[in-house]
Structures are given as C-alpha cells and as structure tokens.
Amino acid sequence: VGSRGSLEQLNRYLEDLGVGLYPSVDFLQVHRNGLADLYLEFLHAPRGLDRSAAYVNTFHIATYQPIDGRQTALLSPARLAEVIDSFLRGYNRYGISGLALGDLGLLLYADYRLNPNRLVDRVMAAEIIAQEVERLAQEKRLMIAGGNAYVLPYAEVLVEAPLFARGTAIVHQTVPFYPLVVSGLVEYAGQPFNLSDHRGEFYLLKLLETGAVPYFALSWDPSFETKNTDFDYLFSTYYPEIKRDVLAVYNQVRAVLGGSWPAVMVDHKVLAPNVCETTYASGLRVVVNYTSQPYQLSEDLVVPAVGYVVLQGGN
C-alpha cells in the first residue's frame, strides 16, 4: 500500500465502512534476512534429527519440484516470544486492531538441539505457539490461516481451513468433521476460490455443504506481474477478470445460506457415495450431489448432477 501514511489511511477508510483490516505476518518463516534483521542460522534456526538447519522448500508451480536456491529459513519455536515482542512494539504504532497470522496456525515442528535444556519437541512447540497466540489475541483481533486445534480458541476468523480431503486413493468417502466443530462458532473459509484445486461448482457445493464463507485472493494489478517472483502462486488474482465469478459465488451462497447465518451445522448425512445432506440450526437442509449423475431424492425430487437442492424443514 506504499507508505505508513497510506496504510493508516486504508485502515481508517475500512473502519468507516465497518470492514476489518488484517495485515498478514509470518512469524515462523524468515522471508527476508538483512543485516538489520539479525537472524543467524546457527542461533535461530530449528535443527533436524541430523542437527542440520531446517527450512521450507519452494516448489515449482507446474512440476511441483523444489526450486534450487528458493528455500525459506525457519525460526526455532524457542525464539518466538522475543520476535513477537519486537513485532508488537512496532505494529502497535499503526493503530490497527486486526492481525492475520499466516503460519502460526499452519506450521508445527521441533528443534532437536544437542543441549537437552534447549531442545523443543512438537508438544512443547504447540504449547509455545498457543501461548504466544493467546498473548496476541489479548491485543488484536486475529485471523488465523490453517487453524490447528491449539489456536482455535483465539481466532475471530479462520481461512485455509480444511474443507476437502487430501484425495488419498483408498478413501472413498469423507466426513466434514472440522466444519462440524467450528461452524457457528467462528467465521471460517477454505482455500481461496480462485487458487483452489477445487473450483467452479465443486467449490460452491462444498460451501453449501459446510457453511463456510466464500474466500478469494484478489489483486488490482494483473497477475502476470507476479511471474518469476516469490508470489507466482498468485496466478489468477486479477479482480477485473474474475469479478463475475466472485459475484456469482457470493450471491448464490447468500441466496441459500444468507437467512441461516451463522450457519451452524447440526447434522450431516451421507445419502449415497458423494451425495450428502446437511441440516443447519435454522432448520434449513441442503442436499449436494458431487457426482456426474442425477440423484433421486424422493419420488418427485431429483438432485441434479453436480448440483444441489434446498429444503426448509420437511419441504
């Protein structure tokens, strides 16, 4: 957004509209390491079982092979508190009430130091992260990506929550357990519609089945500006080109679930393979059909292929 003044102006503009601003920050991934950042691998990086420094690979978007020289360094959970202390001292000067946590709800790893007093296992790491997220939640309204269980109590909004199964070949049916737990308690969304592997009607059906909100990653500049950069995964975000899709998805979800929001799931049934019925607390029932064949729900009611029907009560 440019300068500090531009960010503060954007925050005031959104506040006047009643829209929350959640600038995103990664605390566990070190995307930049200049002289002023003071990140030293031998002091601050987590260690694997072989004592080498751990990192996250960046994968080629077409081949999904790791890209040489594009590894992202990681921060040891033991160092998290001091980094957050430093961040808050600077961030609080902007007067922004929201904050988006990009990786604290997604990543969990150990730090296998030789010194047992400095070793951090995964259980300890989860406890450290939960403690720091709780501290952030006392000062800011939090949007959390991923939503691991130990950060759920502190989230106002969840994004990139798991709505779809991973597609394992031996799995023939899934149950939306995560949405059943969080629906009605916190506003949540899955992957952005325009960046998800599941697009179009399948994405829409999943929103109607789970009560999740539509979620998009949008930019005002053309997507080709991100080519050959660290942001090349934002390959379909140009708002003028996908505006029609954005409005279509929002309007359709609002037409079905708008009167039931927040959409609290109270029952979920698998009527047939890839045909599911969800009942919401309002009495609204939605039957979704992910298959390529119509599903005969009753003598006079058919759920179209890759479609849905909406029932209110017994009607």
Residue ranges of each PLM-predicted region?
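Long, low-complexity, polar and repeat-rich extracellular regions
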Residues: 14, 20, 26, 312-313
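Active-site-proximal substrate-binding groove within the catalytic cores of carbohydrate-active enzymes
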Residues: 27-315
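Aromatic-lined substrate-binding rim segments of carbohydrate-active enzymes
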Residues: 1-21
